[in-house]
C-alpha cells in the first residue's frame, strides 16, 4: 500500500499487480490503464483496510505499525481519492462525500487513543533521534546504527542534504519563498496573500516558530548545537550562494550525534516519519470542513490544537 501510494502520487496512472506468482512472460502485458483512477485508489485503500483488520491495537515491538497506523494511511488514501479528477490536466471534477466520511471514520480519536498517539509537546521532537517512535510518530520507516552490520540500516537517502561544511552536498535547499511562507501577523496567523511581497527579516518580522526547526538559517546554531553556527558563505552553501544560504535542517541530525556515520556522504539512524499524529488531526479537519455538515467548529478546534503546539515550540 505504501509503495503504490507513493507511485500514485508521482505518476497518477500506475501498474497495480496483486498476483505474486505472475510469470515473467506476462509482465509485458501489464498496463497502467487496467483500472480507472478511482479504482486504483480503491485498490490501495483495500491494502490498508486489510492491515487495519489484521494489525493489533498496540505493538509490543517498538516501531512496528499498529492498527492506528493502518487507519491513518487508510484515511489519507480516501482523502486523496475524494478529490475526483479528470483529463491530463488533473481538473477537479468533484469531491466525493462518501470518501470524506471514510476519512472521518478512520481518524476517529478513539482509534488513535488505543494506540497511545498524540502530539509531542514540542514540534522539534519529531525530528530528533532521542525522541524517535514517540507519541506523534504514527508510522515511520525505521533506521539503525551499530546493529551488527557494516553500515547498519542507515538512512542514506538524506546523504546529500547536509551543508557543504558537514559532508555533502547541500542539496534539498530551502527556498526564499519557503522561508517567507512562515511569516505571520502579530496574532500568529499566516499572511496568505502578502507573505512573499518582501523577503523575511529575522530582526523585524513575526514568524511561525516551526521555521527554525525546518530551515537552517545563517547566524543560528545548526540542529541546536552552538558549536556549529551557520554562516552565509561558500563553506556552508554550494555554488557560491547561487541557490541562497539557507540549509536543510529537519531531516538531518546534530553533527556530534552518535547516530551518525561520517564519510564522503553522511548517513544517520534518524527515522523517517511517514505519518504523524498532527497529519491525522489535519486530515480529519479537512474532511469535516469539506463535508460541511455542522462540524466546522470541531474542525477549527483540531487545527488550533496543532497551531497551539506550534506556537509553543521554542525548544
Give the residues covered by each predicted segment.
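Conserved, function-defining core regions and hallmark residues within catalytic/recognition domains
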Residues: 278
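Short amphipathic alpha-helical coiled-coil/interface segments
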Residues: 1, 74, 103, 107, ...
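An aromatic- and glycine-enriched ligand-binding surface/loop that stacks and positions planar moieties
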Residues: 49-50, 64-69, 76-238
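Aromatic-anchored glycine-rich loop motif in surface-exposed flexible loops
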Residues: 2-67, 78-98, 246-275, 284-315
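Surface-exposed, extracytoplasmic segments of Gram-negative outer-membrane nutrient-acquisition systems
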Residues: 216, 220-265, 302
